[in-house]
From Swiss-Prot:
Family designation: Belongs to the 'phage' integrase family.
Protein's UniProt name: Putative integrase
InterPro entries: CB, DNA_brk_join_enz, Integrase-like_cat_sf, Integrase_catalytic, Tyrosine_recombinase_XerCD
Keywords recorded for this protein, A-Z: DNA integration, DNA recombination, DNA-binding, Endonuclease, Hydrolase, Metal-binding, Nuclease, Viral genome integration, Virus entry into host cell
Start and end residues of each Tyr recombinase domain: 155-317
Annotated source species: Pseudomonas phage Pf1 (Bacteriophage Pf1)
Its biological purpose: This protein may encode an integrase, which is necessary for integration of the viral DNA into host genome.
Length: 333
């Protein structure tokens, strides 16, 4: 135990892991016993959690990013979200944060945002603890591991009709940014996310296909396109081996607003929904759609299954009502 008196107060001064470890100095204790108790509590908490006594939730988030988050494609974005979340939670001491603290935060948060947003926050923070546990940097259980997420109604996906698609493309063609039109065409032809189509390089378009790389889930995919679209891409796209298109998201937003479509919360992503919806309504296969969209799980793609003409069609032919009518018709023949 290393404590010393500095004037009228006491200071705890010790090393975390011997002389080679981090030096801990905490000043301002009124009594010697309080300084000694701090050192005892420090090592007790470290033994229980694997983290220093004074580590706060934001410190865990930083450790998570350094050890794992930096390897994720959206790592910096998730870091920013988790840091903001820790701040809204009051940045508690890590060893004091528990499921009850989260439940109280959730109650307050629901007055500001939708339940799905709170569920997203819970998944992000729970993933931080789970990964630190796997890495051996957190010894306690995940405080959110047993917390159930809020049940929400499935959101009906909005998509554009064929007439609306034609109207939107006319507005894109009239845009002052001449890359807006081909990028919109790519999204509608291949189901691409806007940023995937917008960031295409010249080498990614060849052989009648668009080859998407470095995408959201790191799974590359190739989707065929019409010859006319391939020629247009090379004609309008920027020269050289780099990007074909300049940034045109803002130009698309203006074109979309000129159309006056009422699709709250939808902008560029509605092109992806529109492709998938019309693909299924045209009799497309759900597994093929999964590969086209690049979904890692079929669960995400199943949102479009109900649009298939054959979806649950057997409910009519196999229903007892249908069978009774069918039987009655046989009797009267």
């Amino acid at each position: 135990m290393t404590v010393r008196k500095d004037g009228k107060t006491w200071t705890a001064d010790f090393y975390e892991n011997g002389r080679s470890g981090r030096r801990i100095r905490k000043k301002g204790f009124a009594t010697k016993s309080a300084a000694i108790r701090y050192e005892q509590d420090f090592f007790a908490v470290k033994g229980e959690t694997g983290r220093p006594l004074d580590d706060r939730l934001s410190d865990l988030v930083k450790v998570w990013y350094d050890l794992h988050g930096c390897t994720l494609k959206d790592g910096k974005q998730r870091l920013a979200r988790c840091e903001a979340l820790a701040k809204r939670l009051g940045n508690p001491l890590a060893f004091e944060f528990d499921s009850l603290a989260w439940a109280r935060y959730r109650q307050r948060r629901l007055t500001e945002v939708k339940p799905e947003t709170v569920n997203h926050e819970q998944r992000y923070l729970s993933a931080v603890f789970s990964e630190l546990i796997r890495l051996g940097s957190w010894h306690k259980e995940n405080p959110l591991g047993k917390v159930r997420q809020i049940k929400t109604d499935q959101v009906e996906l909005t998509f554009l009709s064929l007439d609306q698609v034609a109207r939107l493309l006319e507005e894109c063609k009239a845009s002052t940014n001449n890359h807006t039109y081909p990028v919109a065409l790519l999204c509608l032809a291949t189901g691409a996310r806007w940023e995937e189509a917008e960031s295409l390089t010249r080498g990614a378009v060849h052989g009648g296909k668009v080859h998407y790389h470095r995408i959201k889930n790191r799974q590359s995919r190739s989707v065929p396109i019409p010859d006319e679209l391939e020629r247009l891409i090379f004609k309008v796209g920027m020269p050289g081996s780099g990007r074909l298109f300049m940034s045109c998201r803002a130009a698309f937003r203006c074109a979309y607003q000129r159309c006056g479509f009422q699709t709250p919360g939808q902008m560029t992503h509605i092109l992806r929904h529109t492709f998938a919806s019309h693909y299924m309504m045209g009799g497309g296969d759900i597994l093929t759609l999964q590969r086209i969209l690049g979904h890692s799980s079929i669960t995400m793609t199943m949102r479009y299954a109900h649009l298939s003409p054959e979806h649950l069609a057997s409910a009519m032919s196999l229903s007892p009502l249908y069978q009774i009518k069918h039987f009655a018709s046989q009797v009267h023949q």
